[in-house]
């Protein structure tokens, strides 16, 4: 049985950053299956490995670390929005730099240029998109979803301080935007994934799950996508300012 959002006056429009793999990939598939039109943004050209309809013509190639490219991309995006309405913005793109051996980068060994790049992609691009699209979101009674991380709330063995602090800041930004944008009819929430099964898992993940996750398993990208879809649906019409953990109870340990 389909939900109200799946059988109403579709297509609604979703803009999602970071769609080529993992959580973003699963989220596009979930919304596409519900009849939404999905516009994707990434630094790379559209990948033919992305199996959703009209994906190539609904893709914008943009470096989210470059304010000039964001400004230019916003102009192009606005031309593509029917009736100047955007129903959902999902800020999923994120980078987590590692040392050459794959270990986490600590504060001392992370050059300030890397910090700036991480914050540009993980935080500042979110601000730029929210500022640039609030009118289109307001016109649709839309919603913003920010993808944070459990690393934004606790020291994580695989995520370094640049990534962790950018995600903590994104959680704070979610609350600020929820407060500012509520009078505009825009809801703003976040999802905070824990250990999620992806194509590349850090060594030691299984041991971390066993010791730190009460449910004793990895989450799936589909489970994260379902929560994102819920937050963009009428079922969550009175939910704003929330940061929902999707971590099998990891945050309680």
How should each PLM-predicted stretch be described?
Residues 2-5, 154, 207, 229, ...:
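Short C-terminal tail/terminal secondary-structure segment
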Residues 182, 187, 239-241:
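Short, small/polar-rich loop/turn modules that mediate ligand/substrate recognition or access, typified
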Residues 20-21:
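Conserved glycine-rich cofactor-binding loop
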Residues 130, 166, 174:
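Active-site helix of classical SDR
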Residues 99-116, 209:
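Substrate-binding pocket helix/loop in short-chain dehydrogenase/reductase
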Residues 149:
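Residue(s) in the substrate-gating loop at a strand-loop-helix junction
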Residues 135, 179-180, 237:
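Alpha-helical segment proximal to the catalytic Tyr-Lys
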């Amino acid at each position: 049985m389909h939900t109200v959002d799946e059988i109403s006056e579709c297509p609604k429009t979703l803009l999602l950053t970071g769609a080529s793999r993992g959580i973003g990939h699963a989220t596009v598939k979930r919304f596409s299956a519900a009849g939404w039109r999905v516009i994707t943004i990434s630094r790379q050209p559209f990948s033919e490995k992305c199996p959703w309809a009209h994906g190539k013509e609904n893709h914008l190639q943009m470096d989210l670390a470059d304010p000039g490219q964001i400004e230019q991309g916003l102009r192009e995006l606005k031309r593509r929005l029917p009736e100047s309405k955007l129903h959902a913005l999902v800020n999923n793109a994120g980078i987590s730099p590692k040392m050459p051996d794959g270990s986490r980068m600590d504060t001392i060994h992370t050059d300030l240029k890397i910090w700036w790049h991480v914050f540009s992609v993980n935080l500042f691009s979110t601000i730029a998109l929210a500022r640039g699209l609030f009118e289109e979101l307001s016109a649709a009674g839309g919603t913003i979803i920010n993808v944070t991380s459990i690393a934004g709330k606790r020291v994580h063995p695989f995520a370094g301080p640049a990534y962790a602090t950018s995600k903590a800041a994104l959680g704070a930004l979610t609350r600020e935007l929820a407060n500012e944008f509520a009078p505009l009819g825009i809801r703003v929430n976040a999802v905070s994934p824990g250990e999620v099964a992806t194509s590349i898992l850090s060594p030691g993940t299984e041991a971390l799950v066993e010791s730190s996750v009460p449910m004793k398993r990895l989450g799936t990208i589909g489970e994260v996508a379902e929560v994102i879809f819920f937050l963009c649906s009428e079922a969550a019409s009175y939910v704003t300012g929330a940061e929902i953990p999707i971590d099998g109870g990891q945050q309680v340990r």
